[in-house]
Design a protein with these regions (language model features):
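Pre-Walker A adenine-sensing motif
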Residues: 1-7
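Extreme N-terminal starter segment of soluble prokaryotic enzymes
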Residues: 9-11, 41
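Conserved P-loop NTPase motor cores
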Residues: 11-35, 48-52, 62-173
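Short helix-terminating capping/connector loops at secondary-structure junctions
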Residues: 37-40, 83-84, 183
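AAA+/P-loop NTPase substrate/partner-engagement loops
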Residues: 38-58
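A structural signal for isolated positions on well-ordered beta-strands in alpha/beta enzyme cores
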Residues: 44, 122-124, 189
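Short, flexible N-terminal segments of the mature chain
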Residues: 61-66, 70, 208-216
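Conserved GTP-binding G-domain of TRAFAC-class P-loop NTPases and closely related GTPase folds
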Residues: 136-219
């Protein structure tokens, strides 16, 4: 089934996959196709190490959009967000940053629990492991409205665990959908957990395909 469903602003997005799986490319396409609606007016990209893909982002033609790159997370980022502006904050490669997960101040978890609503914010967190063992990561995953999963040959249990949580009566459905979506190189599965999304449109892939997104529904 093919449909067209944009990512809605404000929202919380979690993207998980190993190095080189295509996570950053997903964000490039998300911006390039303006697949967030309404589209952000300010984008703050927090990174650990500079990547060539960032040069492509700076070259994107995004009229009236301010793009800022910041090396490493700091608490001032949250306070700089004007609620009268449509903000997007991308947190890339910040899992090992102690400041990003501090108990005090504006940790990443705060972006997911308060920022989206109070700061007119779409926050995107890019990680390698969906089930990283930390209290903050659990809070982030529970408050993610969109989850984008890439294939991780070394950790097949994360999708099985998620399948049991979301579809306890049919856990194999999510696993089968994920296997189909990721059988091609750089394939991914989008899990849409926004409350207004119809149940039949929650699991999908190929979200930037001009012919429409592919949707998976339980049999």
């Amino acid at each position: 089934m093919s449909v067209v469903l944009p990512f809605k602003h404000p929202s919380t997005i979690l993207i998980a996959g190993p190095t080189g799986s295509g996570k950053t490319e997903f964000l490039v396409r998300l911006l390039q196709t303006r697949s967030v609606q309404p589209f952000p007016q300010r984008i703050v990209w927090v990174y650990g190490e500079w990547q060539n893909a960032y040069d492509r982002i700076l070259q994107l033609r995004l009229p009236s959009v301010k793009i800022q790159f910041v090396k490493d997370f700091n608490e001032e980022i949250y306070d700089s967000l004007d609620r009268n502006t449509r903000n997007m904050v991308v947190l890339d490669d910040q899992m090992e940053n102690e400041n990003a997960h501090s108990k005090g101040g504006s940790s990443i978890a705060k972006f997911f629990t308060q920022g989206s609503h109070h700061r007119n914010l779409t926050v995107v967190y890019i990680v390698q492991n969906l089930f990283h063992q930390s209290k903050a990561m659990r809070t982030i995953s529970l408050n993610s409205q969109y989850v984008v999963l890439y294939k991780n040959p070394r950790d097949k249990q994360q999708i099985e665990c998620l399948g049991r949580q979301m579809f306890p009566n049919n856990p194999r459905f999510l696993t089968a959908s994920f296997e189909d979506a990721t059988k091609k190189p750089y394939g991914y599965l989008v899990i849409d957990l926004r409350p207004e999304t119809p149940e039949s449109y929650r699991i999908r892939t190929d979200v930037f395909d001009s012919n429409g997104q592919t949707v998976y529904v339980p049999k």
